[in-house]
Amino acid sequence: MRVYRMLRSRVIPVLLMREKGLVKTVKFKEGKYVGDPLNAVKIFNEQEADELTLLDIDASRLGHEPDYVLIERIASECRMPLCYGGGIKTVEQAERILKLGVEKVSLSSAVFENPKIITQLAERVGRQSIVVCLDVKKRLFGSKFDCFTINGTKKQSVDTIEFVKQIQTLGAGEIVLNFIDNDGVMKGYDLDAVSKFKALVKVPLTVVGGAGCVDDIAKLVQQEKLVGAAAGSLFVFKGKYKAVLINYPSPSEKKKALEL
């Protein structure tokens, strides 16, 4: 397996899309409307975000194809690298999305149904364009994590540790760990769990779930030396009453957070 040298750390907003609008969930439930995706992209452009992840959380659940027209509009507006996930089941769908100007595709449900899609896609477009996103939840008893799909509603019958190893062997260029229990809680990342997973990962690793302030990002990056620190609520809410306000750390805040 190829071992990656340390890349520059990135602070990544994660936007959840439902019915062409943006929502923010808590522990993968509910879904508060937080705005229009094109408007959000324009704001993140102005604030010079490192990268942007857009996930259509209804596409796989409802069996929809990706909304190629909207994806193309968003990609054409985006002045930062864009990763898209949601409803991707085939190599052809993934290739079509990449041709729209998207830099990376994020696979989730598809890798459990057909793990070989990772290898097939890597051979066609290169592993650098392939992200595997694992939605993980800690078991009630013990320290093990299970993988879920379909917005956290379908538990997958895989050994999570072994699956993390397998997807790297198959050609995943990046792994995103999305901690379900931390989603929208804004009380910090699960650093102990991140540390255990990081020991298994030889490709770039991004973590999402739990960030409530820039200091949380700093702790994650500085302790675990991760390539990606991602967040949702942190970048769409502001203040103790969580007013909807698209935001991103200032250059000085980000520089301080990413000091290694």
From Swiss-Prot:
One of its GO terms (biological process) is L-histidine biosynthetic process. It catalyses: 5-[(5-phospho-1-deoxy-D-ribulos-1-ylimino)methylamino]-1-(5-phospho-beta-D-ribosyl)imidazole-4-carboxamide + L-glutamine = D-erythro-1-(imidazol-4-yl)glycerol 3-phosphate + 5-amino-1-(5-phospho-beta-D-ribosyl)imidazole-4-carboxamide + L-glutamate + H(+). InterPro entries: Aldolase_TIM, His_biosynth, HisF, IGPS_HisA/HisF, RibuloseP-bd_barrel. It is an enzyme of class 4 (lyase). GO terms for molecular function: imidazoleglycerol-phosphate synthase activity; lyase activity. This is Putative imidazole glycerol phosphate synthase subunit hisF3. Keywords: Amino-acid biosynthesis, Cytoplasm, Histidine biosynthesis, Lyase. Belongs to the HisA/HisF family. The active site is at D135. Pfam families: His_biosynth. Its EC number is 4.3.2.10. The gene is hisF3. Heterodimer of HisH and HisF. NCBIfam families: AglZ_HisF2_fam (NF038364). Pathway: Amino-acid biosynthesis; L-histidine biosynthesis; L-histidine from 5-phospho-alpha-D-ribose 1-diphosphate: step 5/9. It comes from Vibrio vulnificus (strain YJ016). It is found in: Cytoplasm. IGPS catalyzes the conversion of PRFAR and glutamine to IGP, AICAR and glutamate. The HisF subunit catalyzes the cyclization activity that produces IGP and AICAR from PRFAR using the ammonia provided by the HisH subunit.
